[in-house]
């Protein structure tokens, strides 16, 4: 009996560490596609700062909306964290000084990959 009780306790304790993914949300889906589109539209021949600011603002809307929905959205917020860090770095450096076209293209490539991954995850929820 003690062994059964111990086994049940251990099984339930293991379930506590599992997180339940958040569910589909139309607004989040539209917002992450908007972020992705603004990244795809970056033109490295043009000034980088305003383009980076646009991506930053769209991503911030996504974050604020997700935070406003509550704790259940923590998975989505963690999901876009790497993208946010890359966007913030691009915006900061672009505000300090216009980077080279090569720098922009490399940063854009990274952002495209990160945004694509985030969009697939957000749109793939049920």
Region spans (language model):
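Post-signal-peptide N-terminal segment of Sec-exported extracytoplasmic proteins
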Residues: 34-65
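Sec-dependent signal peptide recognition
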Residues: 1-9
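Long, amphipathic, charge-rich alpha-helical segments that form helical bundles/coiled-coils
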Residues: 58-105
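Alpha-helical transmembrane signal-anchor/signal-peptide segments
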Residues: 21-34
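Bacterial signal peptide processing site
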Residues: 16-19
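C-terminal motif of bacterial Sec signal peptides marking the signal peptidase cleavage site
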Residues: 11-14
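Short, low-complexity, Pro/Ser/Thr/Gly-rich segments in the mature regions of secreted, periplasmic
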Residues: 107-126
């Amino acid at each position: 009996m003690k062994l059964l009780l111990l086994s049940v306790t251990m099984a339930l304790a293991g379930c506590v560490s599992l997180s339940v993914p958040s569910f589909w949300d139309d607004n989040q889906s539209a917002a992450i596609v908007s972020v992705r589109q603004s990244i795809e539209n970056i033109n490295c021949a043009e000034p980088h700062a305003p383009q980076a600011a646009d991506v930053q603002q769209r991503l911030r809307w996504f974050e604020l909306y997700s935070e406003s929905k509550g704790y259940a959205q923590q998975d989505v917020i963690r999901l876009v964290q790497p993208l946010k860090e890359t966007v913030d770095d691009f915006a900061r450096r672009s505000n300090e000084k216009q980077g080279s076209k090569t720098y922009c293209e490399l940063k854009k490539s990274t952002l495209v990959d990160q945004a694509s991954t985030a969009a697939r995850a957000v749109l793939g929820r049920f």
